[in-house]
């Protein structure tokens, strides 16, 4: 009784003495920096660089050909088409004729529409000679991040000049381009075909990269089946995102004889060095377990020309940075087959990120050479066709990436929770093991707690640490308690989506109640995030300069914060899950706190959906570690991510592959028992927020 009275006296004394100044005092303590974004980014880069999938040793031609075949199958089945219905993968091409544009200049344009998956159509344009006999080589041209134009001028120039050299050219309209541009800001969920919306497909258990791959492969299927096309002389090319489509398809589908990707894909090491090279989310399918160096090696011995800019105003992945990984390391694979002359690298001397005349002429030369056509050095002038003429009829209820993801989520059915106690215990244990597998949980203990700052004044004691875990990654933490509080009892771990510096008012309220607190910034939150304050973009000077150069660059970069890019790399090449890493840090920090202090019970207090879900995962993995979880500003279901929607830029760790397919929050609550959950009113959808 005397202990309780003393505690109450100390708490009252601190509260009364500090009064209105308490929040400011706590705010100053919580704003004490523990690590700069550059430090966090360095740790992540080191962590990832140690996990870049190794490029296989070439060996001999027969062995490498067999290895290449096996790797293609594994990449398609285990990663790209993960969760896909077999009927969607194997369905034949479904193209419809939408009319012919007769130019009267020796070529015509056949307008087409085609179905990617049931209910999801896009357009295509086949350039072909007006009169032709026999079979000719054909090239599929992939569009980059173009958005507005139905068919970019540079692709029209390419197509006409390919035809005048004796080739057919099929242009495929990409997601969020041309008639698939769904309006709104390019990188917001209101624009339902924005590529980052593919993250909802991953969350629902169906690889988004499979959608992009299938859209590309359907074009190849169509070309290969045309009676006037030579199936042994098929090519692929594209700029930027079109280059990514070129390498992913041509590496994994051996029907592509010759390929010319232009400025748009990079080795993982390059992506880690300069995170502007990571690409959009489709570039990084979860559990890919292969580097783009391997995809380039899978092209051997087929003819391949890599084109990059010596300088590039849009990408930091320029020729000097990409050549060592994607050309120099790959040349030995061509040497196996004595086909070194089939593998070329061209550095465009002009500072452009375009399929400009320099790059187009290189592609004309390369395809003509390897398709056995006479060389033509000059480019032919082209009349550009306008969007109105190129328009095709697409279904009024055509699917979008976001709507497809929502449809997939709506079809998810999970195992019911058993009603009898014995079966329920078995179910709980089984689901906990499944959770460990889905979030790829690996225990992490604190290797060293680096003391950063401390204070003891105004009736408050505080100690701030950088918690270094055994895997080399860090969290930031501040321990607070009223001066003179009695030993023992419980402590509360406070998590806040925006970082602990935003929790000052709530922390003050808890301290006034006499609570002992550990406020924590887990990986990717607060000052344990690589994102810069005031700008969610990377730290390199060149990227900041790019953002200053024009509005398009700024918009593109702002929506690609390092936290999202590194989350993508962790899932794709490192076979990690950010949510698993964060849950492991929370469990590790809790264990460290119990070991270093006299507390005998731990609670968690969260604000925001990110902190809520990470805490629920941690409690479900270690149900005996925490007594109570108090949730503020959270949600009742992960379906909220789809319906609101919440973007991957807002909550990168929540978009882990299969997470929603296997679990919702009601199941996590049961698995976390005996941890008690106390949840206040859920957060309203951000779209309706005032």
Set out the residue ranges of the language-model regions.
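Bacterial N-terminal signal peptides
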Residues: 7-16
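Alpha/beta-hydrolase-fold serine-hydrolase catalytic core, especially in secreted/extracellular enzymes
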Residues: 21-121, 300, 307-492, 498-516, ...
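Short beta-strand element of the alpha/beta-hydrolase
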Residues: 126-128, 134-144, 488-497
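Gly/Ser-rich "nucleophile elbow"/oxyanion-hole loop immediately N-terminal to the catalytic nucleophile
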Residues: 131-134, 187-239, 256, 537-609
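Short amphipathic alpha-helix adjacent to the substrate-entry channel of hydrolases
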Residues: 153-170, 503-519
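Primarily recognizes the serine-hydrolase "nucleophile elbow" in alpha/beta-hydrolase
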Residues: 218-288, 589-661
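Alpha-helical scaffolding within the catalytic cores
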Residues: 244, 282-298, 331, 662-667
């Amino acid at each position: 009784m005397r202990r309780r009275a003393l505690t109450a006296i100390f708490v009252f004394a601190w509260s009364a003495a500090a009064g209105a100044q308490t929040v400011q005092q706590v705010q100053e303590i919580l704003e004490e920096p523990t690590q700069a974004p550059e430090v966090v980014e360095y740790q992540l880069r080191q962590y990832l660089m140690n996990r870049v999938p190794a490029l296989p040793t070439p060996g001999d031609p027969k062995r490498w050909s067999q290895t290449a075949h096996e790797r293609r199958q594994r990449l398609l089945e285990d990663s790209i088409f993960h969760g896909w219905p077999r009927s969607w993968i194997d369905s034949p091409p479904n193209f419809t004729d939408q009319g012919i544009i007769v130019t009267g200049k020796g070529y015509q344009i056949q307008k087409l529409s085609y179905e990617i998956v049931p209910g999801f159509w896009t357009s295509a344009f086949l350039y072909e000679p007006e009169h032709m006999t026999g079979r000719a080589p054909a090239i599929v041209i992939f569009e980059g991040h173009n958005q507005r134009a139905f068919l970019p001028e540079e692709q029209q120039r390419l197509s006409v000049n390919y035809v005048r050299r004796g080739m057919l050219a099929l242009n495929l309209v990409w997601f969020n381009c041309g008639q698939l541009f769904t309006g709104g800001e390019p990188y917001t969920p209101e624009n339902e075909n924005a590529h980052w919306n593919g993250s909802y497909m991953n969350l629902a258990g169906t690889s988004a990269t499979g959608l992009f791959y299938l859209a590309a492969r359907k074009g190849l299927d169509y070309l290969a089946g045309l009676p006037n096309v030579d199936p042994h002389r098929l090519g692929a090319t594209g700029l930027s995102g079109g280059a990514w489509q070129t390498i992913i398809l041509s590496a994994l589908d051996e029907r592509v004889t010759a390929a010319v990707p232009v400025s748009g894909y990079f080795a993982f090491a390059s992506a880690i060095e300069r995170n502007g090279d990571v690409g959009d989310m489709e570039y990084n399918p979860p559990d890919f377990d292969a580097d783009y160096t391997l995809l380039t090696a899978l092209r051997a011995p087929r003819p391949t020309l890599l084109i990059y800019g010596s300088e590039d105003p849009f990408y930091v992945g320029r020729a000097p940075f990409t050549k060592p990984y994607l050309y120099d390391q790959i040349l030995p694979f061509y040497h196996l087959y004595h086909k070194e002359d089939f593998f070329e690298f061209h550095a465009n001397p002009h500072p452009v990120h375009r399929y400009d005349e320099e790059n187009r002429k290189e592609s004309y030369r390369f395809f003509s050479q390897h398709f056995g056509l006479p060389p033509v050095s000059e480019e032919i002038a082209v009349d550009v066709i306008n969007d109105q003429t190129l328009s095709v009829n697409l279904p009024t209820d055509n699917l979008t990436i976001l709507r497809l993801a929502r449809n997939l989520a709506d079809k998810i059915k999970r195992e019911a929770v058993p009603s009898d106690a014995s079966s329920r215990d078995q179910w709980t244990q089984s689901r906990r093991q499944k959770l460990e597998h889905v979030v790829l949980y690996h225990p992490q203990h604190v290797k060293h707690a680096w003391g950063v700052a401390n204070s003891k004044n105004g009736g408050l004691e505080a100690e701030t640490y950088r918690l270094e875990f055994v895997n080399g990654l860090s969290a930031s933490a501040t321990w607070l308690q009223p001066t003179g509080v009695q030993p023992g009892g419980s402590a509360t771990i406070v998590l806040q989506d925006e970082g602990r510096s935003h929790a000052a008012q709530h922390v003050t309220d808890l301290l006034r109640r006499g609570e002992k607190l550990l406020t924590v910034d887990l990986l990717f939150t607060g000052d344990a995030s690589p994102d810069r304050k005031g700008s969610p973009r990377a730290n390199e000077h060149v990227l900041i300069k790019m953002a200053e150069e024009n509005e398009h660059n700024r918009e593109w970069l702002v929506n690609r914060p390092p936290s999202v890019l590194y989350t993508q790399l962790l899932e794709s090449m490192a076979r990690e899950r950010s949510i698993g890493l964060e849950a492991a840090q929370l469990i590790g920090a809790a264990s460290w706190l119990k070991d270093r202090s006299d507390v005998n019970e731990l609670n968690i207090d969260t604000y925001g959906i990110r902190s809520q879900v990470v805490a629920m995962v941690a409690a479900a993995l270690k149900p005996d570690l925490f007594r109570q979880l108090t949730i503020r500003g959270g949600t009742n279901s992960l379906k909220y991510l789809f319906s609101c929607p919440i973007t991957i830029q807002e909550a990168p760790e929540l978009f882990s592959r299969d997470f929603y397919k296997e679990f919702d929050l009601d199941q996590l609550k049961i698995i976390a028992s005996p941890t008690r959950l106390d949840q206040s009113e859920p957060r309203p959808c951000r779209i309706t927020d005032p």
